[in-house]
Amino acid sequence: MTLPQPVRLYDQPRAPNPRRVNIFLAEKGIEIERVNIDLMAGEHKEPDYLAKIGVAQVPALELDDGAIVTESVAICRYFEALRPEPNMMGREVMEQVIIENWQRLVEFRLFATVAACFRHTNPHLAALEDQCPDWGEVNRGRLDGRLGELDRRLEGRDWIAADRLTIADITALVAVEFLRIIKHPIPDGYANLLTWLERMRARPSTAL
């Protein structure tokens, strides 16, 4: 089956979900036209954007058949099919299963926890969405445990889900690096996590 071709990516490079896609594309060496969307100015909520994209979020990928893809992992899945190597989502079925398992664990247990803390405790976001500061602090209280889960997974391993970098590592990196924004340090003693983080930061694709 011939895949539709990418037209442009609606982007905000420093936002977590777009950054996942941007790292993924950089690892694959894929260049694409980008349209930078100013979230703080509310450009993602403008009528023209909503009419085209359908939801007030980034990233969003426009394809030449008119399709719009708005979920970051789905965008990565498309580009994995378009350019299978270097492979980051699994070649054989069981490898795909393990990678997706860890991608979802990292996304729902760590990435989402960091995001909830940020979205509900950062005063600059109050104009963009309803906040519940208590819920933000509940999630902050979960972070050390979630980071500990990742540290244990990395015992004796270079990468989270396979023998190479995968989308699970990309999701984890974006979550861990966002800890700086919410002023939450990595606890002492998480040596496996810190070694992995140094390895990830050494990759050109992850440069901010």
Model feature map: region roles:
Residues L25, S205-T206:
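Short beta-strand edge/turn micro-motifs at domain boundaries
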Residues M1-P133, E137:
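GST-like domain detector, emphasizing the conserved glutathione-binding G-site
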Residues T2, Q103-P204:
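GST-like fold's C-terminal all-alpha helical module
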